[in-house]
Amino acid sequence: MAKLRGRGIAAVNYPTGMNLGGDPSQALIHATTTGSFVISLSSVDLGQGLKTVVAQCAAEALGLPLEMILVDTADTDTGPHCMGTFASRGTHRVGNAVIMAAREAREVMLEVAAEELEVDPAD
């Protein structure tokens, strides 16, 4: 039997998340008295590095060093709603929830500080 050789190309669509009921994830960000921040999640790190990715997302969005971010994934009773850690959704869904929460937290903190200092928040 003759061996045939050639070249080919393949394309695949790999969905991220399940899109069940919108596939939501939420994140809560708490400022501490030491100036650090705690990110509360109901997703868990299953060895894929989710806690590190989430901390990096928050640090970048808040404009803080990574050392000032603590990620808490231990308590689904106090953590926000999340569909779960499955289907390659951790970084995409949870990471984006953290970025949105961190941006909102930064905006609120800047507004409060600007009002207290009687300056424009953009300054």
Kindly give the residue locations of the regions a language model identified.
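Short glycine-enriched loops at secondary-structure junctions
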Residues: 72-77
